Amino acid sequence: MYSVRFPDMPNVMTFGFSRSHALEMAKEALEGVLEVDLDHALEIPESKYKGGESVEVSPKIAFAIELRKARAARSQREVAEASGMTYQQYQRLENPKKTNPTLETLYRLQKVFNRKFLAI
């Protein structure tokens, strides 16, 4: 039995019957918590823990988190206007269940924030 916990997110714990199963369950647990936290506009903590195994989340969740951090104190409406899209279009980008940016959208956002997103 392998247990998994995230020191920066004490409310996230899981286990698996093998190492690979534990990592699979860790990804599922972490993604679930991050989706809920994003839905409720809660702050996502920066990982400060340097040990252990890294758990990669889906690109949609990673993008939503990166976009929200880049926006920082600006409102969604401000960023939407600056990038030439509607407020609702921008809102969907910060929702991991609905985000699916086109290359054109990524290009616009990179110009607004003066940075690249998700170098995959």
Where do the PLM segments sit?
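DNA-binding alpha-helical recognition surfaces that contact promoter or target DNA
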Residues: 24, 65, 69, 92, ...
